[in-house]
């Protein structure tokens, strides 16, 4: 398919059935391959949508500086769009993010301000808000509270899923900013009320890379509990195990947060098998694994070794 710009190539990603990881012939798991977006992650959708809506609203004009707290993917997506549209961008990142993410941000011209590792992305948000107060002419799009984050998925991801798989019964995504869950969830619920919306959420006081537990003190402003059917608890070992299985059994090379979503999808699928139900379960492959090669998680001999290698790194 032909496009005039990488920005025009955002979205319309493949939906792929996973025959080896699906629990049964009647309970099928489908992967929405968001790693096929131009910068390799689902965040291309909200990044572009937030910028374009800010332009329409007159908040973002030529010569403006974009400010965003991020631990990687959203910043990378915003940096790519900012580069093409001619904006300066400043990203506040926790100091313990993977080197690949820092290199990618710098490659697209982003200026990086490091926030303390303690507190992770929550601390990055605080630092960014302080910078915003100091520089009122900077435009902080703020993915955690910007309705255009969820709006991107309501306008694109949700319709794509329903068009490709009218029989969809469940939608599963990792719980981060909650933009994907809120946007897709609202769209699917409006057009197919029986669809179940499932959030893959880390266990309390456990680190699942790329996700957050809502009970640990920071609830994104976008979050609306009424959109979800359930929150599925996932441990770090579960996420790493499923990430490695996805590569080894289905050939999909994804980031660790995707493993958490897959674990929840498999759990939902097993319940459907036990209840003798038919199900088509869609989960989001949020990004590709190539951004995390330096961690060694994919080449470790065992899951335990992979988890040990990940200690101290932030992937949100």
Segments predicted by a language model, with ranges:
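PLP-dependent amino-acid enzyme catalytic core
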Residues: 1-316
């Amino acid at each position: 398919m032909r496009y005039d710009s990488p920005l025009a190539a955002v979205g319309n990603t493949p939906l792929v059935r996973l025959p080896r990881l699906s629990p049964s012939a009647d309970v099928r798991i489908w992967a929405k391959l968001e790693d096929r977006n131009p910068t390799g992650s689902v965040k291309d959708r909200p990044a572009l949508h937030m910028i374009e809506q800010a332009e329409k609203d007159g908040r973002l004009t030529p010569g403006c500086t974009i400010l965003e707290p991020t631990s990687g993917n959203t910043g990378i997506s915003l940096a790519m769009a900012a580069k093409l549209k001619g904006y300066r961008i400043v990203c506040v990142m926790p100091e313990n993010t993977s080197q690949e993410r820092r290199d990618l941000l710098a490659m697209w011209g982003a200026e990086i301000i490091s926030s303390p590792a303690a507190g992770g992305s929550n601390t990055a948000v605080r630092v960014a808000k302080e910078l915003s107060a100091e520089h009122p002419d900077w435009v902080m799009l703020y993915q955690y509270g910007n309705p255009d984050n969820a709006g991107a998925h309501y306008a694109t991801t949700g319709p794509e899923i329903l068009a490709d798989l009218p029989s969809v019964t469940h939608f599963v995504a990792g719980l981060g900013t909650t933009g994907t869950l809120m946007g897709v969830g609202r769209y699917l619920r409006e057009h197919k009320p029986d669809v179940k919306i499932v959030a893959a959420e880390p266990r309390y006081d456990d680190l699942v890379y790329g996700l957050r537990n809502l009970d640990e003190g920071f609830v994104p402003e976008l979050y609306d509990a009424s959109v979800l059917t359930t929150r599925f608890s996932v441990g770090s070992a579960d996420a790493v195990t499923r990430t490695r299985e996805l590569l080894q059994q289905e050939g999909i090379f994804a980031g660790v947060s995707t493993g958490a979503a897959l674990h929840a999808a498999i759990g939902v699928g097993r319940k459907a098998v036990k209840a003798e139900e038919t199900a088509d379960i869609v989960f989001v492959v949020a990004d590709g694994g190539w951004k995390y090669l330096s961690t060694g998680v994919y080449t470790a001999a065992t899951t335990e070794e992979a988890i040990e290698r990940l200690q101290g790194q932030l992937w949100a």
